[in-house]
Amino acid sequence: MKFPEFKDYYQQLISTSSISSTDSSWDEGNAEVINKLAQWCEDLGCEVEIEEIEKGKLNLLAKLGSGEGGLLLAGHTDTVPYDEGRWNYEPHALTEANDRFYGLGTADMKGFFAFILEAIKNINWKDQSKPLYILATCDEETTMLGARHFASNTKIQPDYCIIGEPTSLKPIRGHKGHVANAIRVTGKSGHSSDPAHGVNALEIMNEIMFALMTLKNKLVKEYHNPGFSIPYPTLNLGHIHGGDSPNRICGCCELHYDVRPLPGISLDGLDNMLRDALKEVEAKWPGRIDITPLHEPIPGYECSADSPIVTSTADICGQDVETVNYCTEAPFLQDLCPTLVLGPGSIEQAHQPDEYLAFSFIDPTISVLSKLMYKHCF
């Protein structure tokens, strides 16, 4: 059988739109990309399972070989929306220029699947002793629906997992989590000339912000991980809106904030810290403060520095293992097995106009993936 060339895989992946968004006007689903991957994997001899988690939201699990353990190569098939006016290249076409592939998803991260398929083609699988798994998920860019569902329901037990997010081929063994909430204060509006006839939501929010800043300082003092460039949890007040006129008592105010916890801080523990920080204000103003999540919280993630996958992958890549501050699906897949994040392209290209993958990553990535397959499947 004549298989597609590497560039053909890449072209078809990029030209097949698979945007996920909390804005329904952008949200597309990933069925078409999953169906392409399924056909290619089957052509290479894989057993393929497709699961529809929600309408148009699919996960794919392909398996090559049999036995216990093995290696799981994982990634997401969705992309973020784009602003066409800021792109100099067609987002849904693979454009070659400046020794780069341009297009939406070239780095983050549909292109990773082309590398997996190319590496599989280049290996003689005759003496394989452990399975190779390929996981393609949905909705990483919004809710991480695919990875959450897979980790909670799968029956496979691979030895190790590699997630192919763009890390410039540097192995990543840890990252912070992300929690984002909205705090809405409902006051009582009225004319500013008579404050006693109203309840100023902005003034209540001022008390809330003071409590959050106290918590921010506590997090810096009490938690420290020297493996991170910013070695403490961060808390950021990112957006606030309230009131409509200087001569009117503010009747409503809303604040959006985020926290990036270090690995080891549980989501429940962080939520308890947040609630404890605000309990005095909530007791003072009963029924006027509502807290709602802006997205499903993502825990921090850390793979032990002593894990064999850490040392062997560092040797294969010739790179020191690092930690980062952005989030991936790793916290969920780490529940299955020791997990690293490692892939071609730079994270600086993710979510940017004229996203690209430099040609200089192509041969090294195929080589690294081939060595990982040999290491963990033979």
From Swiss-Prot:
Q: Name one GO cellular component term.
A: cytoplasm
Hydrolase is among the record's keywords: yes
| Gene3D superfamilies hit by this protein | 3.30.70.360, Zn peptidases (3.40.630.10)
- State which Enzyme Commission number(s) the record gives: 3.5.1.16
Q: Which reaction does it catalyse?
A: N(2)-acetyl-L-ornithine + H2O = L-ornithine + acetate
GO MF terms, alphabetically ordered: acetylornithine deacetylase activity; zinc ion binding
Locations listed in the record:
Cytoplasm
The protein's matches in InterPro entries, at most eight in alphabetical order, are given as: AcOrn-deacetyl (IPR010169), ArgE/DapE_CS (IPR001261), Bact_exopeptidase_dim_dom (IPR036264), Peptidase_M20 (IPR002933), Peptidase_M20_dimer (IPR011650), Peptidase_M20A (IPR050072)
Q: Give the co-factor note.
A: Binds 2 Zn(2+) or Co(2+) ions per subunit.
Active site at D78, E140
The main location class comes to: cytoplasm
Q: Where does Zn(2+) 2 bind?
A: D108, E141, H351
Under the heading SUPFAM superfamilies, the entry gives: Bacterial exopeptidase dimerisation domain, Zn-dependent exopeptidases
Pfam families the UniProt entry points to:
M20_dimer (PF07687), Peptidase_M20 (PF01546)
Which family does the similarity line name?
Belongs to the peptidase M20A family. ArgE subfamily.
NCBIfam families tied to this protein: AcOrn-deacetyl (TIGR01892), PRK05111.1 (NF003474)
**Protein name stated in the entry:** Acetylornithine deacetylase
